């Protein structure tokens, strides 16, 4: 699974996931399913923000050309992927600027058009079950919840899906592709089932050989969302690195 993750996701997403796990004392080489889940969640957050801007009239627009326009502002602020200290700094700054209520838990995004924090969920289970778990944990009507599954299902607060259908379809397609790629390598069952995951871990520890059949070439796509990670905490070199294109699993 670890080899698959490093082949399937952008190196900067992998790095952010590793740092997040180490911050909580977790080892990506051992807890590989969690490693894959965190990388997937990060990519969904970036894709959620991709191409969405606010124009000078305050209207939400979609721009895919990548041409710079000084009158456009990113619609979403990405909070997920930052270390906890800086993430709370961003949240506090948003709250002070907009006057919105400070959440008790770190959200994943902030929507400048709707003026609300967003909690993104990616589940291997039933979407309604995961949604209820999220809602019960957050216990706040101010934070919008949007759940995606690997089967193409989704659920959002008050059935308000925030994004247009095409943008959501891109996310669903990516998740389905990840599922198919895992399944083709015999990794999906262990990713879904905790019992199977333990069995797979024991098997992985016995054999350190790289996973057969991993793609050696991947397609490239630039993600404008990575630019929104710039404020407050990145030097120019890291910003340039984050602007590197996403690496995707090779389609069969």
UniProtKB/Swiss-Prot annotation:
Residues carrying the site annotation Important for efficient shutoff activity: 202-203, 206
Residues the UniProt record annotates as site (Important for efficient shutoff activity and nuclear localization): 195, 198-199
Pfam families from the UniProt entry: Flu_PA
An example molecular function term from Gene Ontology annotations: RNA binding
Keyword 4Fe-4S: no
Keywords, alphabetical: Decay of host mRNAs by virus, Eukaryotic host gene expression shutoff by virus, Host cytoplasm, Host gene expression shutoff by virus, Host mRNA suppression by virus, Host nucleus, Host-virus interaction
UniProt-annotated location(s): Host cytoplasm; Host nucleus
Record InterPro entries: PA/PA-X (IPR001009), PA/PA-X_sf (IPR038372)
Main location: host cell
GO process annotations (BP): viral RNA genome replication; viral translational frameshifting
Alphabetical list of Gene3D superfamilies matching this protein: Influenza RNA-dependent RNA polymerase subunit PA, endonuclease domain
Active site: 80, 108
Domain remarks: The probable endonuclease active site in the N-terminus and the basic amino acid cluster in the C-terminus are important for the shutoff activity. The C-terminus acts as a nuclear localization signal. The C-terminus is recruited to host protein complexes involved in nuclear Pol II RNA processing.
Function: Plays a major role in the shutoff of the host protein expression by cleaving mRNAs probably via an endonuclease activity. This host shutoff allows the virus to escape from the host antiviral response. Hijacks host RNA splicing machinery to selectively target host RNAs containing introns for destruction. This may explain the preferential degradation of RNAs that have undergone co- or post-transcriptional processing.
Family: Belongs to the influenza viruses PA-X family.
Name of protein: Protein PA-X
Organism: Influenza A virus (strain A/Turkey/Minnesota/833/1980 H4N2)
């Amino acid at each position: 699974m670890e080899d698959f993750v490093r082949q399937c996701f952008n190196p900067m997403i992998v790095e952010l996931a590793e740092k997040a796990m180490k911050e909580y004392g977790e080892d990506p080489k051992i807890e590989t399913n969690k490693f894959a889940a965190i990388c997937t969640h990060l990519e969904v957050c970036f894709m959620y923000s991709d191409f969405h801007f606010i124009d000078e009239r305050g209207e939400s627009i979609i721009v895919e050309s990548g041409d710079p326009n000084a009158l456009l502002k990113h619609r979403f602020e990405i909070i997920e992927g930052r270390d906890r200290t800086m993430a709370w700094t961003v949240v506090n700054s948003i709250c002070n600027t907009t006057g919105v209520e400070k959440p008790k838990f770190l959200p994943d995004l902030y929507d400048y058009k709707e003026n609300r924090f967003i909690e993104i969920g990616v589940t291997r289970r039933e979407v309604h079950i995961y949604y209820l778990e999220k809602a019960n944990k957050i216990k706040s009507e101010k934070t919008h919840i949007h759940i995606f599954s690997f089967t193409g299902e989704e659920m959002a607060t008050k059935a308000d899906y925030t994004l247009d259908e095409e943008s959501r379809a891109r996310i669903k397609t990516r998740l389905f592709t990840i599922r198919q790629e895992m399944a083709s390598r015999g990794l999906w069952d262990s990713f879904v089932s905790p019992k199977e995951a333990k069995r797979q871990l024991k098997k992985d520890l016995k054999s350190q050989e790289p996973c057969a059949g991993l793609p050696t070439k991947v397609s490239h796509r630039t993600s404008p969302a990575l630019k929104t990670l710039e404020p407050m905490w990145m030097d120019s070199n890291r910003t340039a690195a984050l602007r590197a294109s996403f690496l995707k699993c090779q389609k069969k």
